From Swiss-Prot:
GO terms for cellular component: mitochondrial intermembrane space. Pfam families: PRELI. PANTHER family: MSF1/PX19 RELATED. This is PRELI domain-containing protein 2. Coiled coil: none annotated. InterPro entries: PRELI/MSF1_dom, Slowmo/Ups. Residues 1-175 form the PRELI/MSF1 domain. It comes from the Eukaryota.
Amino acid sequence: MGIAVEARKVYPYPFQHVVTSYLNKYPTPLEKHVLSVKTVEEKTDPATGVVYRKRIATCNNVIPSFLRRCSILKVSNVYLEEESWLDMKTRVMTLETHCLTWAQYATMKEESVYKECTENSNWTEFTQKGTITITGAGFLNRVLETFAQTFLSHGVKKSISIMETILRERCGCPFS
């Protein structure tokens, strides 16, 4: 069946500040479940100037312990792969993230875009769509999807809150 979560937020900060804050957001004491983020590839297209990055995030497994009785869920860490394309000329950063840990049982994808806001060039618009489809877990498919939907919805709100806090700390009061 699958679930989807969408979010939109306008940060009242310039694109460069938001992108820099995003790329340096983790690890942070504001989110104890993200243990590390490591850049494994980075290159700039000489023709377009677009910066491509591939990063791997190591996160705590937050699946409730009663569900971890299932052997496939008994892992301490979950690994996410994020690919991003930063185009400073058009002031757009596009990201695609997916889960590496349970790829044979679930498809978890997030597509995010940060771009200069059309209403105010000192602001940055963020949009995100996340989907999760669980397969191969038998009767647990729907239970895990329900947990995932709750977790993703909460995670998006928390991530936005963390960005707002980091932007205030690093950049001061927002632009109007």
